[in-house]
């Protein structure tokens, strides 16, 4: 039987269609999932860094407000002015409270160094301990403020908000560590706050001295946290360098 002249043409067209579909499928499968979204690439790691930086910015604002409130509210302003006066006179106890913080940060790792990845992992762990170091003290300050007399709601609410945002930031940092370094072993070591005994004492003077220490340290550390988060985001994600 003689085949119609159109059959080879039909078979060739069908073959071309199959091959074309296969090529399209291979091309589609090669596109990263994030590029296939209409809104563009969504990177959970970058978004978590953004969340952490937003929380750190909120902490910066709250720390400013808390610091100002303690110096202007009748509940604490008089004693804080005395602390500053004693600080100038180099009163040893007040100087310790006004200048020493129980948690510190080293310099971030240099970009592009030979062991940059290992240094970045180590520094991320250090930042976790740095942020977590004040959660315990803040928790105790909230407890003490709740039982002290004539505590303004503005002061109490600020401490609560700072504690909540500290916990939120800590969770973001923990997630980043497990995402970037899934096999990393993390030992969280939050140093003891030496002014806890002052906070737990009976005298208002010593309780406020503990808050003097906390407010100064929280006020200063929020600047550092924002800076180091930007550095880590750049080194880990390559974004916003």
Curated annotation (Swiss-Prot):
Indicate which residues are glycosylated according to the record. 213, 220
Q: Which family does it belong to?
A: Belongs to the somatotropin/prolactin family.
Localization: Secreted
Q: What molecular function terms (GO) are annotated for this protein?
A: hormone activity
Give me the disulphide-bonded residues. 34-41, 101-217, 234-241
Q: Which UniProt keywords apply?
A: Disulfide bond, Glycoprotein, Hormone, Secreted, Signal
Please give the name of this protein: Prolactin-8A9
Source species, domain of life: Eukaryota
May I ask which residue range the UniProt record assigns to the signal sequence? 1-30
Please describe the organ and tissue distribution of this protein's expression: Detected only in placenta. Localized to spongiotrophoblasts and trophoblast giant cells of the placenta.
One Gene Ontology CC term in the entry = extracellular region
Q: Which residues cross the membrane?
A: none
